């Protein structure tokens, strides 16, 4: 029914009264948004680009390659093109524009990114694409290229990436490359690219406190190598480089005395007289502070209930430090320290709030420890979640082996094995083990992986992706510990039948033969929990022992953590260290790893 003029007026009056009284008038209009609208438009624009429909500009790049596309898409993604098409200059009205210095593949990738938001990067195209993104002022694409280059830094290319980032002024890429150079300094100086650094670039690297070198002499040697590559043009720079980069008090006096006159003359006279300057006046490089420590995972601080902590024991100074605990309080993780001193953890489980629940959910987490910041960096997750897997470094790659999950009918050990490529940050499955494994041991020796558990002794050949059985140990047992020491695989302790044993055996890989050694020097009554590690190039046992005493008819327990060193000639173990105080509780599942750590980056607890 149509409204009369009076009814319309009444409605307007009512709205006015509501507004005056602070009551918003009812509004039947609502706002809605389609979350797929933008994607749909992008898909349609890409379809028209592929079909050559409604295109209004042709872009010509190097070698005469032409691309028909849409002005509005180019202008939307790139301030460079927006300015070109809206400035009123000649290009704004032309049907075709020519771009010099842009490769056809790079232009194709830029257009794919503009129309799809996706880009396929490779080592062959990333720098050319970064250059194009820089010219077209597309920072989001530049950042993707930068992250790709950061993820693939290695001694062979880091100098080139550093120089490339320096040229284009990309600060994050430059800093990451520079950090990598400092961390891998001794490897980088062996590369030809190091000799092509500019003077200012060389100084920016060598004058840093974060240089990972154990001796200042390495810094001096790198300068001499750089100088000798172009002696005539670089001799004039030596005084400045020595003055800004060499910390003479940190060098051995005998080394300083043997410096050739041509280089000694380039150094300030008072700096050559090392004896007159105290080493305390110079800040030591980061690498000079490194100390090999024993890291204990799954420890609990005695003052914090069950809260996990990761103590690190420096036996040289007697100090204890604390490493950042695994993210989300992960337990029973696979642990690995690579030959390059990179610390990884994988899998595990996160404790449940329900103390009754023992069927823990397996996790697929994979983390790399960053020494300088004392934090864990996320990496590509495992293909298969697993608890208690073993991590092994072999042939330049990492392997996650076995473990267990709680699925279906309960607890299930795993046969699966996966391989991690550090350059591509990805996992791939490899051949299954012949038998499922949990609570096993895994070690690497001469590019092969050895798995031990009870009567099963397996060998894996990564290049052939092949498993084979080897001669089992003479006293088969489970839940023992294995380590490689002086061309033999040692397997110690474990459970045989229902009894814990302290048996030690050594396997000669070349002879395919097991040899029985003397038992461990631990008292069974002390209920010892034992971990086997190679520490300071020697085979060691880390032992948690429990002692029971009676005081006034009250039983009291105390625990001691001790370190025993093996003498292979005498076939004996000697206690070489005892922790000054029990700062933490080591449960049944504690694990030990050995790595070089930087005390200044850790939290000191004793």
Swiss-Prot record:
Kelch repeat ranges are 342-396, 397-447, 449-487, 488-534, 546-593
Domain annotation BTB: ranges:
55-123
Which InterPro entries does the UniProt record give?
A: BACK, BTB-kelch_protein, BTB/POZ_dom, BTB/POZ_KBTBD8, Kelch-typ_b-propeller, Kelch_1, SKP1/BTB/POZ_sf
Of the GO CC terms on this record, one is:
spindle
What the entry lists under SMART domains is as follows: BACK (SM00875), BTB (SM00225), Kelch (SM00612)
- Where does it reside? Cytoplasm, Cytoskeleton, Spindle; Golgi apparatus
What subunit structure does UniProt give? Component of the BCR(KBTBD8) E3 ubiquitin ligase complex.
What is this protein's function per UniProt? Substrate-specific adapter of a BCR (BTB-CUL3-RBX1) E3 ubiquitin ligase complex that acts as a regulator of neural crest specification. The BCR(KBTBD8) complex acts by mediating monoubiquitination of target proteins.
Q: Which family does it belong to?
A: Belongs to the KBTBD8 family.
Q: What is this protein called?
A: Kelch repeat and BTB domain-containing protein 8
């Amino acid at each position: 029914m149509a409204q009369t003029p009076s009814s319309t007026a009444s409605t307007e009056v009512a709205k006015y009264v509501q507004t005056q009284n602070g009551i918003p008038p009812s509004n039947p209009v609502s706002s809605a948004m389609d979350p797929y609208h933008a994607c749909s438009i992008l898909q349609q624009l890409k379809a028209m680009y592929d079909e050559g429909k409604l295109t209004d500009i042709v872009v010509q790049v190097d070698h005469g390659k032409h691309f028909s596309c849409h002005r509005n898409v180019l202008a939307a993604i790139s301030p460079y093109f927006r300015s070109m098409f809206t400035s009123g200059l000649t290009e704004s009205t032309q049907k075709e524009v020519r771009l010099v210095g842009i490769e056809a593949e790079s232009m194709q990738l830029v257009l794919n990114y503009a129309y799809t938001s996706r880009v396929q990067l490779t080592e062959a195209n990333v720098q050319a694409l970064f250059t194009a993104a820089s010219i077209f002022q597309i920072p989001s694409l530049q950042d993707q290229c930068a992250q790709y280059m950061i993820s693939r830094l290695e001694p062979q290319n880091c100098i080139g990436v550093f120089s490339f980032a320096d040229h284009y002024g990309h600060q994050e890429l430059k800093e990451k490359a520079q950090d990598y150079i400092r961390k891998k300094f001794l490897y980088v100086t062996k590369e030809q690219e190091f000799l092509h650094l500019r003077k200012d670039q060389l100084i920016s690297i060598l004058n840093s406190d974060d240089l990972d070198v154990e001796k200042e002499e390495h810094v001096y040697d790198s300068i001499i190598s750089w100088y000798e590559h172009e002696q005539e043009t670089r001799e004039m720079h030596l005084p400045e480089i020595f003055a800004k980069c060499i910390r003479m008090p940190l060098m051995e006096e005998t080394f300083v005395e043997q410096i050739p006159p041509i280089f000694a003359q380039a150094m300030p006279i008072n700096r050559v007289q090392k004896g007159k300057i105290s080493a305390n006046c110079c800040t030591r490089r980061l690498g000079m502070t490194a100390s090999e420590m024993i890291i204990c995972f799954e420890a609990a601080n005695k003052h914090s209930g069950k809260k996990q902590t990761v103590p690190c024991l420096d036996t040289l100074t007697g100090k204890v430090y604390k490493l950042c605990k695994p993210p989300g309080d992960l337990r029973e993780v696979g642990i690995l320290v690579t030959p390059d001193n990179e610390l990884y953890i994988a899998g595990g489980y996160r404790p449940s709030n329900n103390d009754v629940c023992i069927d823990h959910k397996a996790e697929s987490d994979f983390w790399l420890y960053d020494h300088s910041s004392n934090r864990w960096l996320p990496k590509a997750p495992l293909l298969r979640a697993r608890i208690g897997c073993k991590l092994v470094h072999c042939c330049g790659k990492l392997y996650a082996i076995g473990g267990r999950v709680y699925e279906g009918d309960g607890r299930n050990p795993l046969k699966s094995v996966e391989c991690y490529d550090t350059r591509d940050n990805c996992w791939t499955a490899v051949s299954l083990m012949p038998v499922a494994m949990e609570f096993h041991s895994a070690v690497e020796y001469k590019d092969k992986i050895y798995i031990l558990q009870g009567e099963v002794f397996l060998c894996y050949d990564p290049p052939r992706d092949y498993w084979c059985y080897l001669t089992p140990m003479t006293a088969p047992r489970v839940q023992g510990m294995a380590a490689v020491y002086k061309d033999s695989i040692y397997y110690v302790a474990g459970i045989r039948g229902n009894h814990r044993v302290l048996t030690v055996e050594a396997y000669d890989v070349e002879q395919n033969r097991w040899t029985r050694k003397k038992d461990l020097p631990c008292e069974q009554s002390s209920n010892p929990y034992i971990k086997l590690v190679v520490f300071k190039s020697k085979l060691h046992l880390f032992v948690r022992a429990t002692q029971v005493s009676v005081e006034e008819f009250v039983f009291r327990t105390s625990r001691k953590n001790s370190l025993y060193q093996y003498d292979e000639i005498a076939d004996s173990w000697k206690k070489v260290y005892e922790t000054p105080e029990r700062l933490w509780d080591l449960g049944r599942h504690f694990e030990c790893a050995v790595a070089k750590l930087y005390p200044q980056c850790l939290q000191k607890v004793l």
